[in-house]
Amino acid sequence: MYQEEFPYQIRWAEAEDWTPAMNMIWKTFMKFEGPEYTSEGIRNFLDFITDEDLFHSFLQGKYLMLVATDGAQIIGAASVRDGNHLSLLFVDERYHRQGVGKRLMSYLCEILKKEAGREDITLKAAPYAVPFYRKIGFWATGPEEHYSGIIVTPMRKRL
């Protein structure tokens, strides 16, 4: 079977990647998730991705993030906290349906299993992302939740 080579790079994020990654995340959030959230939810999401404590955790290696790049441009990002909880997964809309999100998740799951000895990964999926996560092997562990203006479905995947 012919399999096309993945044309983008996936690597650990560095300090200088933080701002461009968060800008891409914010832009993508506002396009695909923001319309379903209340103004409170949008504010809470923005507060989360601009939180200085989160940035410092990243700099200290406590908040891990992978980025996908096309040349020098960050086109996707995936981050994990608390050892095995996917905190953020976003792909620039121009790169949707090109395997970027799937590849980021594949790399992240492999790292969690082989290097960190984790048996599963959890996340709280926005409504827009639930079909994607189901397609890559996640299942809902509870009903859709609404809190602080944010809508999520708790999900899990065995590694």
Predicted regions and their residues:
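A short helix-loop-beta-strand connector motif used in the catalytic cores of GNAT acetyltransferases and
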Residues: D51-L66
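Conserved GNAT acetyl-CoA-binding A-motif
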Residues: L112-A126
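A short, internal acetyl-CoA/4′-phosphopantetheine-binding micro-motif in the GNAT/acyltransferase core
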Residues: L86-H96
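A short beta-loop-alpha structural element at the N-terminal edge
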Residues: Q9-N23
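Conserved beta-hairpin
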Residues: K62-G76
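Conserved acetyl-CoA-binding loop-helix of GNAT-fold acetyltransferases
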Residues: R97-E110
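Conserved GNAT-fold acetyl-CoA-binding loop/helix
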Residues: W26-D53
